[in-house]
Amino acid sequence: MSNRDLFAELSSALVEAKQHSEGKLTLKTHHVNDVGELNISPDEIVSIREQFNMSRGVFARLLHTSSRTLENWEQGRSVPNGQAVTLLKLVQRHPETLSHIAEL
């Protein structure tokens, strides 16, 4: 393990941030496209699960969630959070993703 001088690194970062805010330093920036809000319908969730011919319990276990949560998503009683929607969309577009998840 390397010995880092965290205080020096933090001090340097603060100086750079101050210089940047004063227009004296141009920091490297990245532009990220706004992907918008991801949505998924209950029918889509059911369709994804049925695409793999899996029971609710097995599919939920692979997604690292409870079967009750998956049931609520499928019946529209609750809405999956952004991470869950992203994972479901990824599995929908790239079915091999599910086998990679199963290896975790």
UniProtKB/Swiss-Prot annotation:
Coiled coil: none annotated. It holds the Pfam family MqsA_antitoxin. Residues 45-98 form the HTH cro/C1-type domain. Keywords: DNA-binding, Toxin-antitoxin system, Transcription, Transcription regulation. GO terms for molecular function: DNA binding. Induction: Induced by amino acid starvation and the protein synthesis inhibitor chloramphenicol. Residues 56-75 bind DNA. It comes from the Bacteria. The keyword Protease does not apply. PANTHER family: ANTITOXIN HIGA-2 (PTHR36511:SF3), MERR FAMILY BACTERIAL REGULATORY PROTEIN (PTHR36511). HigB-2/HigA-2 has been shown to stabilize plasmids very efficiently in E.coli. Antitoxin component of a type II toxin-antitoxin (TA) system that counteracts the effect of the HigB-2 toxin. Binds to its own promoter and regulates transcription of the higB-2/higA-2 operon. This is Antitoxin HigA-2. The lineage of its organism: Bacteria, Pseudomonadati, Pseudomonadota, Gammaproteobacteria, Vibrionales.
